[in-house]
Regions:
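Polysaccharide-binding and catalytic clefts of secreted carbohydrate-active enzymes
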Residues: 47-138
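Aromatic-lined substrate-binding rim segments of carbohydrate-active enzymes
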Residues: 1-53, 68, 75-79
């Protein structure tokens, strides 16, 4: 997860020794900079195609296969390492869905996923137009 090896082990043990329960969070809602630098295709794009940069909250694209694979890998690694630790009382893998317009992405992956969802939901363009009230020809 980080280049600072052992810091989380020390933090968990320190809190456990003090008798505190820990809600373990994963860095999946805001992927770390080193991960975004290695895999820039995971970030969301705005309407003009500009990437949401590191330092903003929730800068990943929900539809990115790269992001989804890395989020699963990170979550599994943290769960395997700390899942049975007696100080861990709960897990938080994400929160605040939709805050700060962060659910919007105009990336290739997001557009493809939206089109796939439309096709699965409506089946045909005619059915989509009927459901959405699009009665104008183009």
């Amino acid at each position: 997860m980080t280049t600072l090896q052992g810091w989380l082990d020390r933090a968990v043990e320190t809190l456990h020794a003090a008798g505190l329960g820990i809600i373990m969070g994963t860095p999946t809602a805001t992927p770390p900079k080193w991960l975004v630098d290695r895999m820039p295709d995971m970030v969301a794009l705005d309407e003009q195609g500009r990437p949401r940069g590191f330092g903003s909250r929730r800068h990943y694209c929900f539809s990115s296969d790269v992001y989804l694979r890395q989020a699963e890998r990170i979550t599994r690694a943290v769960a395997e390492r700390y899942g049975r630790h007696p100080a861990i009382v709960a897990w938080q893998t994400d929160n605040e869905y939709g805050c700060h317009d962060t659910v919007l992405s105009f990336s290739v992956a997001a557009r493809a996923a939206f089109r796939e969802w439309l096709a699965e939901r409506y089946g045909t363009i005619t059915a989509l137009n009927r459901a959405w009230g699009n009665v104008f020809w183009s």
